[in-house]
Amino acid sequence: MANTLHYSPQALKDLDEIFDYIFTDKQNPIAARNTIEGIKNSIAELKTLDNIGVKVRLPGDLETPYRFIQYNNYLTFYRQIEKDVYIDRIIYGKRDYIKLLFG
């Protein structure tokens, strides 16, 4: 049985902001579309693959409930509880994601 994906409102906002930034600021509508499509395709893998990606740890090697997968420069942070996968954030990889997630 496949996992069910649940996007948080913030994750959906992140996707919109990524698209808008590439489309408007970088003036590249094709790259904007391709980037969002690539991120969504990488997230779709979570339907069939359990707990893939890297575990997120805090300083001091403290565990968190998060894992992340990467598409190009973007990191998708998610939690998996049984067959439910919660997509919480999609963040540019060079940002301080610890602060954004736990800040």
Stretch-by-stretch model annotation:
Residues 44-70:
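A short, surface-exposed loop/turn module that caps and links secondary-structure elements
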Residues 71-103:
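Enriched for short, Lys/Arg-rich terminal
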Residues 2, 53-55, 59, 63, ...:
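Generic secondary-structure boundary/loop-capping signal
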Residues 41-52, 83-85, 93-96:
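Short, charged/polar surface micro-motifs in flexible loops or helix N-caps
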Residues 1-38:
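Arg/Lys-rich, positively charged N-terminal/basic patches that mediate binding to nucleic acids
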Residues 22, 29, 33, 50-57, ...:
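Secondary-structure transition/capping residues
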Residues 10, 39-45, 69-77:
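A short, hydrophobic secondary-structure junction motif
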